[in-house]
Amino acid sequence: TTNGAAKEICVALSATNGTQLWAAVMDDALYPQGGVGLDDGPRTTPAVADGSVFVLSSYLKLYRLNATNGAILWQRNLASLYGGTIIAHQNCASPVIEGALLFLNANTGTSTLMALHLADGSPAWRSQDEALTHSTPVLATIHGVRQIIFVTQSNLVSLNPQSGALLWRFA
């Protein structure tokens, strides 16, 4: 808790001895439909690249932290920026990184599947109108074609990771 309010916290531990290196306070830790109880979260896994830790909170807030000291380098409230909505049990999908892009489903009103630039969190592309699930996207090469695959509420959707162009959809 911070000032009496429950908060989601990202913690870095030493790989050598497990001691805490730093802790960064992120977002509110309120889980009214948490399934198990009010303390059932967060459920996402941070992604690490370019000396940074990227964290997507239960309430669709994306943070870039300095991997050395946990300082917040930038943050984006995806729900506010893109009209996203929080689903029951909050977000559970983790961000995925390849090269200079971070992939996620922000559950925005339109063009929900997106890639953001690691450097500043600005959109590289947004594509498709697909409702969020608790599934983390997967990068794969299938028949020689690199793709980012999302499980959504209605479909399995594959996109070109560089452009966001639809490769295939399975309902």
What are these regions (language model features)?
Residues T1-A171:
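Noncatalytic, solvent-exposed loop/strand surfaces
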